[in-house]
């Protein structure tokens, strides 16, 4: 039997959780974090990460929605990478877990290099 996909992906104006429904025509449905049957501490972390992400939205010019500095983004990315490992363990038996690990790990490396440059300038 096919497992439905459980996708962890941040987007503006919605939860970062997407779960497929419907056996004949699998369609992703956005699911509120509060509705997940997971560890309460992990649930709280996911809620906080989603809140932090939603805060970066720029109402005046949406294409410029971004973190204000490399440090805040680096901390956010690290927290996302930690939360995704735990979330996959929580739901991985029930669903096919989907997360763009390469993108997030690459972003962490980019930010790490940027921070090294920032702190090693004379």
What kind of region is each of these model predictions?
Residues 1-122:
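Intrinsic low-complexity, intrinsically disordered or marginally ordered coil/linker segments
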């Amino acid at each position: 039997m096919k497992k439905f996909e459980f996708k962890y992906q941040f987007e503006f104006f919605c939860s970062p959780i997407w779960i497929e429904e419907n056996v004949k025509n699998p369609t992703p449905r956005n699911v509120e974090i509060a509705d997940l049957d997971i560890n309460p501490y992990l649930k709280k972390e996911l809620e906080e990460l989603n809140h932090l992400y939603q805060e970066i939205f720029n109402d005046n010019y949406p294409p410029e929605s971004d973190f204000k500095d490399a440090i805040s983004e680096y901390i956010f990315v690290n927290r996302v990478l930690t939360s995704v490992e735990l979330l996959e363990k929580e739901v991985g038996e029930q669903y096919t877990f989907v997360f763009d690990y390469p993108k997030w790990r690459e972003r962490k490396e980019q930010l790490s290099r940027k921070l090294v440059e920032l702190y090693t300038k004379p």
